[in-house]
C-alpha cells in the first residue's frame, strides 16, 4: 500500500506534504493516508512505518485517512488491534476517518472492536480532527487547523 503524510495547505485542505512544501503538519496529530489493502503481505511495511512514528516519540495521536483502504484481512486486523492498543496505553491513540464499512465489518466480526473500541472511527477527516483536537494535552505549536488556538 501507499502511505502518505498529509498536511494542511494554505487553503486548509489536507494534501500530501510531498506535493506542497508549504503544507503544515500538526505538532500533536500525524495524519497518514493509506491507499491499498491491508493484508498479511503488506503488514510489514505498515508496521515499520508506524514503529518509526512511535519511536520518534513526538506525536501523541495518529489519524489514518482510510478511505483508500479497500480490504483488511485477519492478519492485518490482529496487527492493527495490537498497534492501536499500544498507542492507547502509552500515547493518545490511533483513529480512522472514512474506513469503509466492509473493512469495519472484518474488525467487528473478528471481535477486534471489543478490544479497541468503536469510538476510534469517524466518517470524515474534519469531524475526526475536531474531536481528536479536544483530547490534546499539549498546546498547539502552530495553527494548522481551525480548532487550533495559539
Segments (PLM) and residue ranges:
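Cytosolic C-terminal regulatory domains/tails of membrane transporters and channels
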Residues: 1-150
